[in-house]
């Protein structure tokens, strides 16, 4: 497994998006993982509709702007037979009624894989599969006001996960400062152009390996 990987440099990752005042991080994490897998399969990077997931995946257990899980989103896409493009079904940051149109579907999946809850397993998946959906504890002001460097907060929990994000790579600075490259959905103004480097191999810091998964296409 390589010592560093960055899928943003290989065309797998769309520009940073902004979820706004809606608890839809799970939808952004899910589209991010599927955008990467569709690019891997087709060589085309197409931005996918979070709004489609917000509006339509309640039967799978999601709650729109009140939260959800990436695996439920992948399950919806499988059962629905597709997911519309961002362009055809733009983001509104609010709960609206399902307006899925199969003719605008830009992706589908056959299910999902849950990665074993270890950073080594996550590292292997990121290296071999592509961007991976993960959930983290992002409930600290240190995270909300993050700007640069490797994020580490001793109060971060590996169990109380409240935010879905996308691991797009990993790397290291110096001898032992290892990090995950994480795409957030709080717009490009947040953090480092919308990204955060999160401490890696520090006892599953912030729970990054606790609920990691990706869709199969």
Curated annotation (Swiss-Prot):
Residues reported in the UniProt entry to bind Zn(2+) 4: 92
Molecular function terms from GO: cysteine-type endopeptidase activity; endopeptidase activity; metal ion binding
Regulation: Inhibited by the propeptide produced by autocleavage. Long isoform of CD74/Ii chain stabilizes the conformation of mature CTSL by binding to its active site and serving as a chaperone to help maintain a pool of mature enzyme in endocytic compartments and extracellular space of APCs. IFNG enhances the conversion into the CTSL mature and active form. Inhibited by CST6. Inhibited by the glycopeptide antibiotic teicoplanin. Inhibited by amantadine.
One GO cellular component term: apical plasma membrane
Keyword Secreted part of the UniProt annotation: yes
Reaction(s) catalysed (UniProt annotation): Specificity close to that of papain. As compared to cathepsin B, cathepsin L exhibits higher activity toward protein substrates, but has little activity on Z-Arg-Arg-NHMec, and no peptidyl-dipeptidase activity
Subunit structure: Dimer of a heavy and a light chain linked by disulfide bonds. Interacts with Long isoform of CD74/Ii chain; the interaction stabilizes the conformation of mature CTSL.
Annotated protein name in UniProt: Procathepsin L
Name of encoding gene: CTSL
């Amino acid at each position: 497994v390589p010592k560093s990987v960055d899928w943003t440099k290989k065309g797998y990752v769309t520009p940073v998006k902004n979820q706004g005042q809606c608890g839809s991080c799970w939808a952004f994490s899910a589209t991010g993982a599927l955008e990467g897998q569709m690019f891997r399969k087709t060589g085309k990077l197409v931005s996918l509709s979070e709004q489609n997931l917000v509006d339509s995946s309640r039967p799978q257990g999601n709650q729109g702007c009140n939260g959800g899980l990436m695996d439920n989103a992948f399950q919806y896409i499988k059962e629905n037979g597709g997911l519309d493009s961002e362009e055809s079904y733009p983001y509104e940051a609010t709960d609206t009624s399902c307006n899925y149109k199969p003719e605008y579907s830009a992706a589908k999946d056959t299910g999902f894989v849950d990665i074993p809850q270890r950073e080594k397993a996550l590292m292997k998946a990121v290296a071999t599969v592509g961007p991976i959906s993960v959930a983290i504890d992002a409930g600290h002001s240190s995270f909300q006001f993050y700007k640069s460097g490797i994020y580490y907060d001793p109060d971060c929990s590996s169990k109380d996960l409240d935010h879905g994000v996308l691991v797009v790579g990993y790397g290291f600075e110096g001898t032992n400062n290892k990090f995950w490259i994480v795409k957030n959905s709080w717009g490009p103004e947040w953090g480092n152009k919308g990204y955060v480097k999160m401490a890696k191999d520090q006892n599953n810091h912030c729970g990054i390996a606790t609920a990691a998964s990706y869709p199969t296409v």
